[in-house]
Each structure stands twice: as C-alpha cells, then as structure tokens.
Amino acid sequence: MPIVHVDCWEGIGEEKVKKMIRGITKAIADVGIPAHAVEIVVYEVPKTHWGVGGEPASEKLKDISPPK
C-alpha cells in the first residue's frame, strides 16, 4: 500500500510530526485506502543540507524557521 515520504527542515518537533502523520493518513483514507495500510516516513533535514536557488537554505532563508 502507499508509502509517503515527507522531507522537512529539522526542528519541526514531535507533536507537529504526529499531527502531520495523522493528517496525511486521514487524507489517504478519505479516498478509500485503509488507514492501517498507510506508511509515512518523515525526514528532518538540516537547513545546511537543503539547497534553494543554489544556496544552502541556512543562508538564503535564514530568517525563516519551522512552525512552532
């Protein structure tokens, strides 16, 4: 069944990750896939390892932080 991979900046926090997992699972279940068959993998990537427009996000987007 479906495996969903989510890439996000590190630091989003466990509660937000849990909420995201529940929300994604519900969205997939709403189209008829059994919730127990949905797998979700969340990768938290440091902004220093995330490129935007040829620069590390840590430099280009230094004023932006993950939601608290």
Regions found by a protein language model. Name each.
Residues 2-68:
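A domain-level signal for the structural core that forms small-molecule/cofactor-binding pockets
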